[in-house]
């Protein structure tokens, strides 16, 4: 963990954006989890350290997934959207991240 803490510059690049969707808000209300879009090469340990550093909360566990990009048509040719890596971050009981307050 100390090895990960030393590289704060890397931790600032791990979290790309919070995922605000219907499913993400249902998960947040029910299981005390928050969903983030993360860098494609980010590890679970880096995601945990980044959330703890940026939001000053305690993280219980992290689950990651890679959502494959869809085939889409761009004009005449077929293309493909990029893959997205998401992290479901489970917070310890009593911990909360409020994005409206963090933005101000």
Swiss-Prot record:
UniProt keyword Iron present: no
Matching InterPro entries: Nucleotide-bd_a/b_plait_sf (IPR012677), Ribosomal_uL23-like (IPR013025), Ribosomal_uL23/eL15/eS24_sf (IPR012678)
The keyword Ribonucleoprotein appears for this protein: yes
GO MF annotations, alphabetized: rRNA binding; structural constituent of ribosome
Gene Ontology annotations for the cellular component aspect, listed alphabetically: ribonucleoprotein complex; ribosome
Keywords: Ribonucleoprotein, Ribosomal protein, RNA-binding, rRNA-binding
Record-linked Gene3D superfamilies: 3.30.70.330
Top-level taxon: Bacteria
Cystine crosslinks: none
Gene Ontology biological process terms in this record: translation
Its job: One of the early assembly proteins it binds 23S rRNA. One of the proteins that surrounds the polypeptide exit tunnel on the outside of the ribosome. Forms the main docking site for trigger factor binding to the ribosome.
Entry-linked PANTHER family: 60S RIBOSOMAL PROTEIN L23A
Record's subunit section: Part of the 50S ribosomal subunit. Contacts protein L29, and trigger factor when it is bound to the ribosome.
Alphabetical list of NCBIfam families matching this protein: PRK05738.1-3, PRK05738.2-4
Family of this protein: Belongs to the universal ribosomal protein uL23 family.
Name of the molecule in the record: Large ribosomal subunit protein uL23
Organism: Burkholderia multivorans (strain ATCC 17616 / 249)
Gene for this chain: rplW
């Amino acid at each position: 963990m100390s090895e990960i803490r030393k590289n704060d510059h890397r931790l600032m690049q791990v979290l790309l954006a919070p995922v605000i969707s219907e499913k993400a808000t249902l998960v947040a209300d029910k299981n005390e989890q928050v969903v983030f879009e993360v860098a494609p090469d980010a590890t679970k340990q880096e995601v945990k350290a980044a959330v703890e550093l940026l939001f000053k909360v305690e993280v219980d566990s992290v689950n990651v997934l890679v959502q494959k990009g869809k085939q889409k048509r761009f004009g005449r040719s077929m293309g493909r959207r990029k893959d997205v890596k998401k992290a479901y971050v489970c917070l310890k009981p009593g911990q909360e991240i409020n994005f409206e307050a963090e933005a101000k």
